[in-house]
Amino acid sequence: MTHPDPTLFGHDPWWLMLAKAVAIFVFLLLTVLSAILIERKLLGRMQMRFGPNRVGPAGLLQSLADGIKLALKEGLVPAGVDKPIYLLAPVISVIPAFVAFSVIPLGGAVSVFGHRTPLQLTDLPVAVLFILAATSIGVYGIVLAGWASGSTYPLLGGLRSSAQVVSYEIAMGLSFVAVFLYAGTMSTSGIVAAQDRTWFVFLLLPSFLVYVVSMVGETNRAPFDLPEAEGELVGGFHTEYSSLKFAMFMLAEYVNMTTVSALATTMFLGGWHAPFPFNLIDGANSGWWPLLWFTAKVWTFMFLYFWLRATLPRLRYDQFMALGWKVLIPVSLLWIMVVAITRSLRQHGEGTWAAWLLTAAVVVVVALIWGLATSLRRRTVQPPPPQSTGAYPVPPLPSVGTKETADA
């Protein structure tokens, strides 16, 4: 089994680093084009219709045609916008989405024209924190787009997005703490190497569930697409955008989906390690094969995104906030304490740490399910109390005698 050697990072020739950067960029672009088409096809099938079927064979060129259409559209700038910020917001939104993918390991070490290099652009001792920071910067583009548009609906969408990121970035960060305790590192390649024998999804199931819910909220996808709710805010923060500027926001959304899916694969599903039973085959985790396993796992999460969009209705804003602050964050804190205690018992020679961890995982999962059911259940709205005639803000109505006197 070939794990990336940390000494390999930063020693590649310039042309190899450039080639890996371009390859990652092309990989993300192709993933976005494929994801848009597959999502529309799957939604069509789930809604008993065909989906895109006109452009190209079986509609396979529909995403490319949509991209060309957006590129050729006139770039309108509405009157009353803050033009510099209005034009800069899509750029701020899309660049961090690509940058965050630079520390994701796509495979082990391979040989390219005689140079041994990992299938990863670079790695850092705090690579996971770097991803969290990069994805958090992207929300500034959304907030600035809402602020600079000079319209009420985009502004409300930007405010919702900022509140959403603040709420769910905390839960997402806390879900990683248990992984750090087990792996002993924040390096993405080190976390993948720590899952050589057992994936963390089996050991840290509550952290995985919290992360899955948080990643959907982090990317503004259904049922958490409150910043761009069509029925409430028209189009949200990109209501006033068209042509390439709108395309950049859409590109950033799907690249973020790919990034958080790749991060979930890295943190919980063993990264590029082959799943069972392929891991029993000699050479399944060497060469270029890990790239196939990694891509398959990422597309599993992408399908989850599409499935949720076709299945679940949008949550109310109060339900969304209650889920983040009253369920995910407390459960994450409780689970961190459980994992820390079990790790401490294991270091002191206690042999029953696995049973403790499994029991605690069951308890935390039950608490998480109960919290979800409690926060999302339909609440009974109490009718407003009846107001007396003289109570504020209803003014006293004139009596019949007063009206007759006024008419006379």
UniProtKB/Swiss-Prot annotation:
Classify the protein's membrane topology as the record does.
Multi-pass membrane protein
Which GO CC annotations does the UniProt entry carry? plasma membrane
Q: Which UniProt keywords apply?
A: Cell membrane, Membrane, NAD, Quinone, Translocase, Transmembrane, Transmembrane helix
Matching entries from Pfam families are given as: NADHdh
Task: Enumerate the subcellular locations listed in this protein's record, separating them with semicolons.
Answer: Cell membrane
At the top of the EC hierarchy, this enzyme's class is translocase
The domain of life is Bacteria
Q: Membrane-crossing residues?
A: 18-38, 84-104, 124-144, 165-185, 198-218, 261-281, 288-308, 321-341, 353-373
Where composition is biased (Pro residues), the residues are: 382-398
What Enzyme Commission number does this protein have? 7.1.1.-
Report the catalytic activity: a quinone + NADH + 5 H(+)(in) = a quinol + NAD(+) + 4 H(+)(out)
Segments for region (Disordered): 381-408
Q: Which GO terms describe its biological process?
A: aerobic respiration
Which is one GO molecular function term here?
Answer: oxidoreductase activity, acting on NAD(P)H, quinone or similar compound as acceptor
The subunit field of the Swiss-Prot or TrEMBL record says:
NDH-1 is composed of 14 different subunits. Subunits NuoA, H, J, K, L, M, N constitute the membrane sector of the complex.
Give the protein's function: NDH-1 shuttles electrons from NADH, via FMN and iron-sulfur (Fe-S) centers, to quinones in the respiratory chain. The immediate electron acceptor for the enzyme in this species is believed to be menaquinone. Couples the redox reaction to proton translocation (for every two electrons transferred, four hydrogen ions are translocated across the cytoplasmic membrane), and thus conserves the redox energy in a proton gradient. This subunit may bind ubiquinone.
HAMAP family listed in its UniProt record? NDH1_NuoH
Name listed for the protein in its UniProt record = NADH-quinone oxidoreductase subunit H
